């Protein structure tokens, strides 16, 4: 069992139950999945850019990335329907907790001028979205092998009903929210 999952079972569940007064332990919010999405705009012209992004994503997430395709044609972006424009990974279970642990304790502290993540990026349904500006903050990525700095979206999907519950859950996991 991963470190973060053990902390959840032993400490977080009890803390959440005490704070919100849940009657049943199945009511206690938990992390459902983490979705990592990387939009690669230049992929429509350059297939190598997408390959590099997929490779980086697989190194960071530890599992195979799915290539995302454009759903609609947009003339202003010179984009046609069905063209590959990015990649994503959905993490669940052990890999999800392992990634969350690495993100919170290793990657985020390596961000330049880091003062915490935005505490207002909840969607109203207990999910949290976080933008990462460069993939170099992850220790698995070798600086010399990076062709271009790319950002990504990391979405924490929880079973929490409200943003307040989700914020408390992520705070107990150690997410460094700015004041």
Curated annotation (Swiss-Prot):
Annotated disulfide bonds: none
Keywords (A to Z) from UniProt: Ribonucleoprotein, Ribosomal protein, RNA-binding, rRNA-binding, tRNA-binding
UniProt GO molecular function: rRNA binding; structural constituent of ribosome; tRNA binding
Alphabetical list of Gene3D superfamilies matching this protein: 3.30.1440.10
Keyword Ribosomal protein found: yes
Domain of life: Bacteria
GO biological process: translation
Signal peptide stretch: none
Keyword Ribonucleoprotein: yes
PROSITE patterns for the chain: RIBOSOMAL_L5
A Pfam family annotated for this UniProt entry: Ribosomal_L5_C
Entry GO terms, CC: ribonucleoprotein complex; ribosome
InterPro entries, sorted: Ribosomal_uL5, Ribosomal_uL5_bac-type, Ribosomal_uL5_C, Ribosomal_uL5_CS, Ribosomal_uL5_dom_sf, Ribosomal_uL5_N
Family classification: Belongs to the universal ribosomal protein uL5 family.
SUBUNIT field: Part of the 50S ribosomal subunit; part of the 5S rRNA/L5/L18/L25 subcomplex. Contacts the 5S rRNA and the P site tRNA. Forms a bridge to the 30S subunit in the 70S ribosome.
NCBIfam families: PRK00010.1
Function of the protein: This is one of the proteins that bind and probably mediate the attachment of the 5S RNA into the large ribosomal subunit, where it forms part of the central protuberance. In the 70S ribosome it contacts protein S13 of the 30S subunit (bridge B1b), connecting the 2 subunits; this bridge is implicated in subunit movement. Contacts the P site tRNA; the 5S rRNA and some of its associated proteins might help stabilize positioning of ribosome-bound tRNAs.
Protein name as it appears in the record: Large ribosomal subunit protein uL5
Annotated gene: rplE
């Amino acid at each position: 069992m991963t470190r973060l999952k053990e902390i959840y079972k032993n400490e977080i569940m009890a803390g959440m139950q005490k704070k919100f007064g849940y009657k049943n332990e199945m009511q206690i919010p938990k992390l459902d999945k983490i979705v990592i999405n990387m939009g690669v705009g230049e992929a429509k012209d350059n297939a190598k850019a997408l390959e590099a992004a997929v490779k980086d994503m697989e190194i960071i997430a530890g599992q195979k990335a799915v290539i995302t395709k454009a759903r609609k044609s947009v003339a202003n972006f010179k984009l046609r329907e069905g063209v590959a424009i990015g990649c994503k990974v959905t993490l669940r279970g052990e890999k999800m907790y392992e990634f969350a642990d690495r993100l919170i304790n290793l990657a985020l502290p390596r961000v330049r001028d880091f003062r915490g993540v935005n505490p207002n990026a909840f969607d109203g349904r207990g999910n949290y979205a976080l933008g990462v500006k460069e993939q170099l903050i992850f220790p698995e990525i070798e600086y010399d092998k990076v062709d271009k700095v790319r950002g990504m979206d990391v979405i924490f999907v929880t079973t929490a009903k409200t943003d307040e519950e989700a914020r408390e859950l992520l705070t107990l996991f150690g997410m460094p929210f700015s004041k």
